[in-house]
């Protein structure tokens, strides 16, 4: 059920193929059409060390800093909420709230079973309209030279007073997952002597091959355990040596070091200097 509507005067104009001046002209036309509405610009920002929001209307600039676990999506929604909480000023009854976050507007536009908590707060604040206040919402493209939007963006990125805002479950979950993966990667980065580290230096998941037997063979090559190189362990025999090199059989030696196969390396890879990551890494050959 649709419960919230917004304007998009830039519909049909894709950012990749539209000059900034076109967006500025479209925005100017929208402002002339809704000239009695006080423009209110909102923006949210998130970097590695800062999460904040900015609100600009009349001669007022508001900005606040949030907990680092908050997502940029939540920051964009909170900027809209802050705007609604502050725009009621004497002698003005018509406001147009501009945001460059289409995802925030869409989340307000469509009713879902699990709404973001800030979405609920914003929708409740819309009851202001019943008091004779007319508030409309509009999307505006970011970073195209629209002054109010640029000011809100600068305010959102600036250091400011901290606002105590609860962090929603999804943001906490994502932040915790990112922290765990970061610690995992830092720990794995120290395992430089682990033979798997040179093949898979990142803890990110690799796409699986569609054929299972190919996955099995590739996994055996990556860990260096194959029937050819390790059969002697099952049979209780001595480790066999490569006749020409006088070294034990190993996947690494056969694929990387053995001079007998140099001509194959040059033929297929145009070089005799390869690594296991080149051959059986994320994009295996």
Task: Label each residue range with its predicted role.
Residues 1-257, 264-285:
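RNase H-like, metal-dependent ribonuclease domains
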